[in-house]
Design a protein with these regions (language model features):
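Mid-to-C-terminal alpha-helical segments outside catalytic/metal-binding sites
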Residues: 1-10, 14-48, 227-229, 240-304
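Short beta-strand segments
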Residues: 4, 50-53, 94, 181-183, ...
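Conserved, mostly hydrophobic/aromatic
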Residues: 6, 33, 78, 82, ...
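Divalent metal-dependent hydrolysis catalytic cores, especially in the metallo-beta-lactamase
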Residues: 19-20, 27-66, 89-96, 118-119, ...
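Alpha-helical scaffolding within the catalytic cores
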Residues: 24-37, 72-79, 104-108, 163-168, ...
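Active-site gating/metal-coordination segments in enzymes
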Residues: 62-153
Length: 304
């Protein structure tokens, strides 16, 4: 089972990143996910993905509706995709406390109960708040996450507000909530991968997202972290998921580039770890080429 924790389909050009070309909509996303991607000599697809709007589309613009209506508007296309392709897309609710912390918490609960959302996204840089100081802004949503076992994905890797350790106060206050350190603490403006690593080492409810991590570092970290502590996420688009799958596949090779990881361990990293966290049925790696080819259409082909 391959599950991407970090996808951004959109039906309009992103307000912040302003990627050129046509919008990277759900259908383009599915085509990208279908690959196929060669993993240890077998063709694979990304079976499922957690989807969220591009963060630039979740801030207030003149003319937007306010409060819960505005939140529902920026989540509308993601909600539509989760209902149109329920076997491929899982909802990730973007929580912007500047629309009102209680409004966001109520909308999170609505999306969980009505549409099966299983994840929440925090992006303190894009939404402009200090996570270590704005605890009253975060608590309402975290209480909902605790109630419904919603996993929290945190954008990290650049200042001023998304250095990983700035989230320690809320993480420690909610030990019953699982947190993913997005990008393994790395962005174009910073590298906090060792902070992310030590947070995952020291804190039971923290795991790290593989995407953006340097290849030479992820093998170093994977050797020391418990196997359940790494999940696969690509931040696509603009990233291309094949390179991040290859980064994990390399762990199956001998040292120093790899760590002789077995295929079951690789499958945990690529999808089964996040599946267990979110209550999704897991699947073992395909044993044969024929089984792998069947899995390109049916994620559970050959699974008892």
């Amino acid at each position: 089972m391959i599950i991407d924790t970090h996808l951004h389909p959109t039906n309009l050009v992103d307000e912040a990143w302003r990627h050129t070309g046509t919008p990277f909509n759900g259908e383009r996303m599915l085509k990208m996910m279908d690959g196929p991607y060669m993993i240890n000599g077998k063709p694979r697809r990304i079976d499922m993905g957690f989807i969220q709007p591009p963060p630039g589309n979740t801030g207030y613009r003149d003319g937007n509706r306010m409060g819960r209506d505005g939140i529902r508007d920026y989540m509308a296309y993601i909600t539509e995709l989760t209902q149109r392709y329920p076997d491929r897309f899982i909802g990730n609710f973007t929580y912007n406390p500047r629309w009102g912390p209680e409004n966001g918490a109520l909308e999170l609960e609505f999306h969980v109960k009505e549409y099966g959302f299983k994840m929440l996204k925090l992006h303190a840089n894009m939404h402009g708040y200090r996570p270590d100081r704005a605890l009253d802004w975060l608590r309402p949503a975290m209480k909902v996450c605790a109630k419904y076992n919603v996993v929290v994905l945190i954008h990290t890797g650049d200042g001023p507000y998304t250095i990983p350790t700035m989230f320690y106060p809320i993480i420690r206050e909610f030990p019953m909530v699982n947190f993913i350190i997005g990008h393994f603490g790395i962005q174009t403006g910073g590298n906090y991968s060792f902070e992310a690593f030590w947070m995952a080492m020291d804190t039971p409810n923290v795991v790290c997202e593989s995407g953006w991590c340097f290849q030479s570092r992820i093998v170093e970290f994977a050797k020391q972290l418990d196997r359940k502590k790494i999940v696969f996420g690509t931040d696509s688009p603009p990233n291309e998921p094949g390179m991040w799958l290859r980064e994990l596949e390399v762990l199956c090779s001998p040292a120093p580039q790899g760590m002789d990881l077995d295929e079951d361990g690789l499958e945990d990293y690529m999808g089964n770890n996040i599946a267990r966290m979110c209550g999704i049925k897991t699947s073992p790696p395909p044993k044969t080429m024929a089984e792998a080819e069947l899995r390109l259409k049916d994620s559970y082909a050959g699974v008892q």
